[in-house]
UniProtKB/Swiss-Prot annotation:
It comes from Blochmanniella floridana. The keyword tRNA-binding does not apply. This is Chaperone protein ClpB. The Clp repeat (R) domain probably functions as a substrate-discriminating domain, recruiting aggregated proteins to the ClpB hexamer and/or stabilizing bound proteins. The NBD2 domain is responsible for oligomerization, whereas the NBD1 domain stabilizes the hexamer probably in an ATP-dependent manner. The movement of the coiled-coil domain is essential for ClpB ability to rescue proteins from an aggregated state, probably by pulling apart large aggregated proteins, which are bound between the coiled-coils motifs of adjacent ClpB subunits in the functional hexamer. Residues 3-149 form the Clp R domain. The lineage of its organism: Bacteria, Pseudomonadati, Pseudomonadota, Gammaproteobacteria, Enterobacterales.
Length: 872
């Protein structure tokens, strides 16, 4: 027996078999050790595939061989000096391998020959091979073909297998090992795919759909059905290989190297009628590997697709299919389109329930059913630029991840105690150096507190560790249950009824009962940790994604909506009609009565300057989103020229800036829940109004990239100063009705009827009176009070007399409240800053703003007790 004649794979297998024999304390290397190595290690996958093609039930054979290996006699070695040698049976089989290689006129002994030699021997391995259902004649033909063609061709069975292992991923093998997520629903799409695959010609389906709808999942579902024998006879022995295009391209240094690799893959796939090639992102094939004058990958697969030699399934998106595949008519006609639509909310919930166990096992948390329903409904409502079920799955995944981080981190109560203990220890160390009585007394008090805190910490820490241990026990039980279910599926496939019975009626019910008891026990005892995902965590994650306040997502704002006018009036003074109109629109939207295909509301604010048009927009942004930053403010004076209109939607193709995002559409794509303020709308070019017609009517807009932008969750507010010149010249500012009629006439003359008719409400703001200005001044001064408080001046206030004095000086019916801000700066902020810098006003004491002899004065007191004072 010459080992140098064995191929590299066979030599490695013999070395691995020797290691297994040593590990199991066996005295000799037996043939079953070699077979166990072939079946166990992934690097010998070609042997496994050979056995499958020869009709062997590989799973059953593996279990039988493993059992025989475990039952072999053991001879334990204390010092490890015993040498393991080949048994007489193995030597006979190896000699027979040499004889068979000579019969096939081969100078090299391949590992595949070992199977024939083992089958012809009288060893126990021969019995196991025959029991597995192997067909001897078919095996000999396959090996003979391998041996006879090796020296001449490079396309032998073994080399084909190695090429496929290098450049593809076996999806059916992943399904067999239970490494794929379960595919729930999608029965119609999978059935349609099977139907196309069974056709005589054009049996190559291409799955087309938006990103995230589950195209790849359908192929995985098909692989699972193949493993479970739930497909027609023509597909029962098939396997699905996913093409790894990155592996094909990686390391291709020279021209033609990619084409050579790809041609080998195509040849290997076409030689096996039971192999289906899956090309994810099919559009990548168009242009892949193409250099000057050479063919790309798509042109290489066309002939094989046309002749029916290649069984192929593709997947791509709608946009990329139209951009790449449809342009090549010859390539398009060789595929049969299957459109994958987005599942509805009910189907998404079913999908999430099916995936629930996998995510629970991964994160070691419990995902409640309300969380699943919330993930499907909220993602559908608030995330408009992605598809179900992908966005709902991501919500569940991230929410479960946040709970897992909390479990792994130290609880807040424990962390607070830990920091307090460190602080007390530092103080005690410092006080030990002092010798006065006060320090000693303080040290005694701190030592008692430290002892108490350490005791509390010890109790809490032990409880935290116990709760964590309980959660990890649950995870281990879930993991064991998952493994048991996987083995049950494998036993069902190979028909091992004894093991099926043991698992189905013994092991699995026992683990399920154990899991139920562990969960019930942990729920009663949990105080520091929380191991379940609820709709609150889903809403928190969604709030971080979209910037929408969590209270709004969870619909906890009913009282807030009912009192919306009161809240807005705290910031906007004297505009009851405008506040009422805005509040009604928001309430209609929240109650679900408004048209879902239009913006929440579209308004035009008219009136003289300085009456609160822009301020109302800021107040609305604060009310809806708890921030002023949720407002997209566009100054329409920047769009007076015709060429500047393209900035709203983006530059057309061929122009500089085509790739960069548009101002309006890009802002809404990134933050779909916002207020769009179109300031001074009358200054915009007429083409801007043509764009706005579609937004106001349909709630959507298409940008220069062809992407649909959804405006259904925006509030569109346009402000205008139309008619303000007439107001200043002809009318008494207090005559509101006349002023409103005049302004509306001007608006109707300026804007086209189709634009006016699409606006929900046109609001003419009321002019401000001296009473309104007093309230506005008080609001403005509150911002000053907060800044003073930060500088160390608490409880700043102003007298009624001083407030009236400022309001009278700042009152101008033509300019509204804008002059008031300048008056506050001039009369209060400027002199106040001088006094602070000159130390006339000391920190830590209150400041009262008063008026004496028509001059503002600042009085500093320890306590303010004047009832005639506005206090922050």
């Amino acid at each position: 027996m010459r080992l140098d004649r064995f191929d590299r794979s066979f030599q490695l297998a013999l070395s691995d078999a020797q290691s297994i024999a040593i590990g199991k304390d066996n005295q000799f290397i037996e043939p079953v050790h070699v077979m166990y190595t072939f079946l166990k290690e992934k690097k010998y996958k070609s042997i496994r595939n050979l056995l499958i093609h020869a009709g062997s039930n590989v799973d059953q054979l593996y279990k039988s061989v493993e059992q025989v290996c475990n039952d072999l006699p053991r001879v334990e070695s204390v010092d490890g000096d015993r040498e393991v040698q080949c048994s007489h049976a193995l030597v006979k089989i190896l000699n027979l391998c040499d004889k068979l290689a000579q019969k096939y006129h081969s100078n090299i002994i391949f590992s595949e020959v070992f199977i024939i030699a083992a089958l012809q021997s009288q060893d126990v391995l021969s019995i196991l091979l025959k029991k597995s259902g192997i067909v001897k004649e078919l095996l000999e033909k396959l090996v003979q073909y391998e041996q006879s063609n090796y020296s001449i061709h490079d396309d032998s069975f073994k080399n084909r297998t190695q090429i496929l292992e290098q450049f593809t991923v076996d999806i059916t093998s992943l399904a067999e090992q239970n490494n794929l997520d379960p595919v729930i629903g999608r029965d119609e799409e999978i059935r349609r795919t099977i139907q196309v695959l069974q056709r005589r010609t054009k049996n190559n389906p291409v799955l087309i759909g938006n990103p995230g709808v589950g195209k790849t999942a359908i192929v995985e579902g098909l692989a699972q059905r193949i493993i479970n024998k739930e497909v027609p006879e023509g597909l029962k022995n098939s396997r699905i290989l996913s093409l790894d295009i990155a592996a094909l391209l990686a390391g291709t240094k020279y021209r033609g190297e990619f084409e050579e690799r790809f041609k080998k893959v195509l040849y290997a796939v076409s030689k096996d009628n039971n192999t289906i090639l899956f090309i994810d992102e099919l559009h990548v094939m168009v242009g892949a590997g193409k250099t000057d004058g050479s063919m790309d990958a798509s042109n290489m697969i066309k002939p094989k697709l046309a002749r029916g030699e290649l069984h192929c399934v593709g997947a791509t998106t709608l946009d990329e299919y139209s951009r790449y595949i449809e342009k090549d008519a010859a390539l398009e006609r060789r595929f049969q389109k299957i459109f994958i639509i987005e599942p509805n909310i009910e189907n998404t919930i079913a999908i999430l329930r099916g995936l629930k166990e996998r995510y629970e096992l991964h994160h070691n948390v419990h995902i409640t059913d309300p969380a699943i329903v919330a993930a499907a409904t909220l993602s559908n409502r608030y995330i408009s630029d992605r598809q179900l079920p992908d966005k709902a799955i991501d919500l569940i995944d991230e929410a479960a991840s946040s709970i897992r981080i909390q479990i792994d981190s130290k609880p807040e109560d424990l962390d607070r105690l830990d920091r307090r203990i460190i602080q007390l220890k530092l103080e005690c160390q410092a006080l030990k150096k002092e010798s006065d009585e006060l320090s000693k007394k303080r040290l005694e008090i701190l030592s008692m507190e430290l002892s108490q805190k350490e005791q509390e910490y010890s109790v809490l820490e032990s409880e935290w560790k116990r709760e964590r241990s309980s959660l990890f026990d649950i995870q281990n039980i879930k993991s064991d249950l998952e493994k048991a279910k996987t083995i049950l599926d494998q036993s069902r496939r190979i028909g091992d009824l004894a093991q099926m019975s043991e698992l189905q009626y013994g092991r699995i019910p026992e683990l399920e009962k154990k899991l139920f008891n562990a969960i019930q026990s942990s729920n009663k005892k949990m105080r520091l940790l929380r191991n379940y995902v609820s709709e609150v965590e889903i809403a928190e994650v969604l709030s971080k994604w979209t910037g929408i306040p969590i209270s709004r997502i969870l619909a906890n704002e009913k009282n807030k909506l009912l009192n919306m006018e009161t809240i807005l009036h705290q910031l906007v003074i004297g505009q009851d009609e405008a506040v009422r109109v805005i509040s009604n629109a928001i309430r209609r939207s929240r109650s679900g009565l408004s048209d879902p295909k239009r913006p929440i509301g579209s308004f035009m604010f008219l009136g003289p300057t300085g009456v609160g048009k822009t301020e109302l927009c800021k107040a609305l942004s604060q009310f809806l989103f708890d921030t002023d930053n949720a407002m997209v403010r566009i100054d329409m004076s920047e769009f007076m020229e015709k060429h500047s209109v393209s900035k709203l939607l983006g530059a057309p193709p061929g122009y500089i800036g085509y790739e960069s995002g548009a101002y309006l559409t890009e802002s809404i794509r990134r933050r779909p829940y916002s207020i769009v303020l179109l300031d001074e709308i009358e200054k915009a070019h007429l083409d801007v109004f043509n764009i706005l017609l579609q937004v106001l009517d349909d709630g959507r807009l298409t940008d220069n990239q062809g992407r649909m932008v959804d405006f259904n969750n925006t509030v569109i507010i346009m402000t205008s100063n139309l008619g303000s010149d007439l107001i200043q010249k002809k009318f008494d500012i207090s005559d509101y009705d006349t002023m409103k009629k005049t302004v509306l006439n001007v608006v109707n003359q300026y804007f086209r009827p189709e634009f006016i008719n699409r606006i929900d409400e046109i609001v003419v703001f009321h002019p401000l009176s001296i009473k309104h200005l007093i309230d506005i001044a008080n609001i403005q001064l509150k911002y000053l009070y907060s800044r003073l408080e930060e500088r160390g001046y608490p409880r700043t206030g102003i007298t009624n007399k001083a407030l009236l004095f400022l309001s009278k000086i700042g009152f101008d019916p033509i300019y509204g409240a804008r002059p008031l801000k300048r008056i506050i700066q001039q009369y209060i902020e400027n002199p106040l800053s001088q006094k602070i810098l000159s130390d006339d006003l000391l920190p830590g004491r209150s400041i009262t703003i008063d008026v004496q002899n028509d001059n503002i004065v600042f009085i500093q007191n320890d306590v303010i007790d004047d009832k005639d004072i506005y206090i922050n």
